[in-house]
Amino acid sequence: MKERQLRATELPLLDLATAYIQAGETLFLAIHDDIAARVRLAHPEAAHLEISIDADGDVRLHGIWSAQDSAIGSCHLLYDPHDDPERDWLDGPLDLDELVSDLNRVLEGSFLYHWGVIEPHPVHEHRNRRWITLPPADRAATIAAVIRRHVPDAESLVCRFEADHKGIAVGFEQITLSSGERVNIPCPRCSPESEDSPWPHDVSHELARVLGQLYIMPHLRGLHLTPCVDLASEHEGQLWQLVFPYREPGSVQPSAHG
């Protein structure tokens, strides 16, 4: 006899809390994506929004900034909000009232804070302001670029995800190279002393944040992540494979794994 699926109201309280948080995070990340798309329509190089939140919880936009320039070590101010009607042409296709309204929506809860996209302002004199990092325009390409900085001939990544009321935890299993070779990634919980990780610990955090967003947003999960099986894995639970964007053969030197 087929098992009856539990209704939402019949789920244990912890499962209900997890489902509620995941639904909120999915919605707010989707709004965050939409904000980024509209900002980049006017300012393609945009990477950060500088905002403040007053005592009533209302958001004020102070600037739109580029990513950090490695050559000079700072960001470029792309747009400085103003109250001068004669300078409205500088706004381009960006509707600032609509943008601020959506920022108010996503910042009234704590969901985006869990993903590390909202941080204190990097300049101490503006410490009462917030620094919002916009999501990558292409998360899969961003993940591939980060990993290929450390493993140049990487072609795919296998990982697992654990969802609970605290968020999404990401476990890295292995990388597949262009030669077909598989490189296992040590688990920090199972092998805390291992130094064989292909990238530094802070890179794992950077990757986990973007991978978690791919997983929690259904349309991105369906587009980029494929369920897979590895009988040799030391961990239980579903594994997922992310195949990296195509690259011209011979464009990189083989890495020294093996």
Region annotations inferred by a language model:
Residues 17, 24, 28-34, 38, ...:
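Core catalytic machinery and nucleic-acid-binding channels of phosphodiester-processing enzymes
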Residues 49:
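Conserved functional acidic sites
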